[in-house]
Every structure is written in C-alpha cells, then in structure tokens.
Amino acid sequence: ADVKKITETVIGFFEPKKGKCPAGDEYTFLLNVTSNAAGGLEHANSTALAAPRKWLPCTHDKKRTDNYVQLLTLFAHEYFHTWLVKRIKPAAFIDADFSEEAYTSLLWLFEGFTSYYESMLVRRAGLIDDEVLGKLLSKDLKAVVETPAHMAQSLSQASFDAWIKFYKPSANSVNAHVSYYRQGALAAWVLDAEIRRKTKSLSLIHISEP
C-alpha cells in the first residue's frame, strides 16, 4: 500500500493530466534483500533494488521506522528515474554505448534532484511528517558539510569525474570528491527555498505543472 501511494504521487508529479506512467500499466520492482548492501538501478519499465533486511517493516511496528523510511525513499528514488533519467536524460545518455563510459557534467541534477524529491514525494504521499522530512534533509546537509571535498570540487566536476573518482574510491576520496547525490540534493533544496522566498506562492515542485 505504501509503495502504491509513492507511485501514485510520482505519477501525479510528472503526469498531472494523463495520470499514467509512461512505462505502461505494468512496472516491476525487483527487491533483493541483503545483509548490508543498499542501492538501485533503474530501467525503462522496472527497477532492481537492494536493501538490508533491517529496512523491511515488521508486523508489530506501530509506526514507520527510520529504516523502513529509507526503503520507501529508495522506492521513490528509482521510480522517479522512470521520468528523470530514462525519459528526460543528458545528451550523453541518448543512444549511449553501454560498453564504455558516458561522461556528463549533469549527474548532480539528475541524481541530486531525484535524491531531493525522494524525500519530498514520500512526504507528499503522506508517509512521513514534516519532522521526519527535516531529519532526512538535515542528514544530507550534515554529510556534505562534514566532507572536506565539498569546498574543493564543483558539482559539475563531481559529475564528470564520476567514472574515475566516485566509482573508484580511495583513502583520499573524502578530501577529493563530493557526492553529487547529496550535494545535488542540497542544490535542489536551496533552489526550492529561493523560489518559495521570491514568489511567496510557487516552489520547485511547480516544474511538474504545465
């Protein structure tokens, strides 16, 4: 039921008039339960997810636990990619040759904005409250500020260098490379706040509306 609420909310975000997913009536979530690993990989009509067993809900839980909320945001993140990345994508990803790297300086937008909305849309679906949303955003802020590299590398550089740095971490990564996921999410948060401040009535979420 919770995942259904998420999919309906994401569809409403991108398709307020049509009310349908571009993948059609069938979309498959493949969840692999692990000991510790977590992540996801989006496809045009499905997504492959990995989540620790502790993220799964228990029948005796009286409320959604922090671990379960992480699972919900993972579902939201990968489903959001059905539009942003699979349908709306950087030029380098169009007709890309998957046997080699595809470089782009825009990963911070595609992954960062998705990371921001994974929390915002779970909140919009009514699955968390404002307090929990604030904790999720603050967690990203804390992680970025405490990473020395956030003052040494731009988001566009972090995106372009992903193949040689982000995906090949070293002992010096904390000093040399930022997460375009988390720092990109903060960029979306700041942009959203600035739009709200200046317009008094609009927000970043209005980009989904005609």
Enumerate the language-model features and the residues they cover.
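Hydrophobic alpha-helix feature that most strongly marks membrane-spanning transmembrane helices
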Residues: 84, 88, 146, 168, ...
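Feature representing long, continuous alpha-helical segments
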Residues: 74, 135, 182-189, 193
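Acidic/His/Gly-enriched intrinsically disordered linker/tail segments
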Residues: 88-97, 101-182
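Residue-level detector of conserved catalytic or cofactor/ligand-binding positions
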Residues: 202-210
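Short glycine/serine- and small hydrophobic-enriched flexible loop segments
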Residues: 116-123, 186-197
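Surface-exposed helix-capping loop/turn segments at secondary-structure junctions
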Residues: 12-23, 89-91, 123-130, 195-202
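Juxtacatalytic substrate-recognition/specificity segment
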Residues: 1-107
